[in-house]
């Protein structure tokens, strides 16, 4: 009996091997908006069928996108997200396990033992469409030829090349996103034009962005082709506030001295009009220097007057702010002071 059983097992293994030894020869996406989106179908032994979404994840979709010469993964649809396949189509693959670096789905670990999967569990894939006008996504952004990294001519990195941006596709909401992405303050001059000295050279990025102004970076905005024959005379120039930085100078430690704040790439002083203990507290807190000492700021002038710009005046804090940038003050650069009125702050040197 044992020899007969072994013979039957051998015949069965040959039959199974003849049916499933070959990996899928072709992959396609069906039912989506373009060739790089849809239900995943594979060809196996001349028959097209679907893939079960058991364990289907972003790594598997990445391989499908790569095999089809599509762009990056956008989504990993599961559960029959697209139109149902033809009634005669079978579910050919129960499970797919890719590490995400394979060039084709055939190089992944595939399970052909379909036992509990229906077309309601068909796997899908959504990749960037390289044939679409919408594939203008900037990889990075920078502001150049300005006084600091928060002011200048807008340039975006696209397909490994820096390009200027036409102001026809620019607005306040886009500027807000750029300022946030660069780690700068709020948007000031939002979409001015470059002058002859600050115009760029080389390619002009012909994309138009639609942002709400709340996005973390430009990649989260909607993009389309800009139908405009722009020249470098229309290069976009914008300015953000600098990151709110402050320091105490002239003292024996970083926790005592004349107060200076950074604006437009330059350090300047703060006028002591209306300055008091609450404002001292906020500065010490922001610098990690503990609590403020000497509650009569008007009486201490021991670190000498500053030079250059006086950036802030009439600063008013509640004392609860974590940074001086959240306190009320006059517009940057507006004041009625001299450097004899520069603010000085002395803190305890450590958090308590």
UniProtKB/Swiss-Prot annotation:
One GO CC term, this protein: cell surface
Annotated site (Not glycosylated): 316
Post-translational modification, as annotated: N-glycosylated. N-glycan at Asn-99 possesses only alpha2,6-sialylated terminals, while Asn-229 possesses both alpha2,6-sialylated and non-sialylated terminals. N-glycosylation increases secretion.
Regulation: induction: Transcription is activated by nuclear receptor liver X /retinoid X (RXR/LXR).
Record keywords, A-Z: Apoptosis, Cytoplasm, Disulfide bond, Glycoprotein, Immunity, Inflammatory response, Repeat, Secreted, Signal
Pfam families: SRCR
Cell compartment(s), UniProt: Secreted; Cytoplasm
ATP-binding as UniProt keyword: no
SRCR domain segment(s): 27-128, 141-241, 246-348
Signal peptide start and end residues: 1-21
Cysteine-cysteine disulfides: 36-70, 52-117, 65-127, 98-108, 166-230, 179-240, 211-221, 255-289, 271-337, 284-347, 317-327
Tissue expression: Specifically expressed in tissue macrophages. Expressed in thymus, liver, spleen and lymph nodes. Present in Th17 cells; mainly present in non-pathogenic Th17 cells.
Positions of glycan attachment: 99, 229
Keyword Nucleotidyltransferase: no
InterPro entries: SRCR (IPR001190), SRCR-like_dom_sf (IPR036772)
GO biological process terms on file: apoptotic process; immune system process; inflammatory response; positive regulation of complement-dependent cytotoxicity; regulation of complement activation
Summary of the knockout phenotype: Mice are apparently healthy under specific pathogen-free conditions. However, thymus of mice display much fewer thymocytes and CD4/CD8 double-positive (DP) thymocytes are more susceptible to apoptosis. Increased adipocyte size and adipose tissue mass. Higher level of free cholesterol in Th17 cells.
Function: Secreted protein that acts as a key regulator of lipid synthesis: mainly expressed by macrophages in lymphoid and inflamed tissues and regulates mechanisms in inflammatory responses, such as infection or atherosclerosis. Able to inhibit lipid droplet size in adipocytes. Following incorporation into mature adipocytes via CD36-mediated endocytosis, associates with cytosolic FASN, inhibiting fatty acid synthase activity and leading to lipolysis, the degradation of triacylglycerols into glycerol and free fatty acids (FFA).
Subunit structure: Interacts with FASN; the interaction is direct. Interacts (via SRCR2 and SRCR3) with pentameric IgM (via Fc region); disulfide-linked.
UniProt name for this protein: CD5 antigen-like
Lineage of origin: Eukaryota, Metazoa, Chordata, Craniata, Vertebrata
Protein encoded by which gene: Cd5l
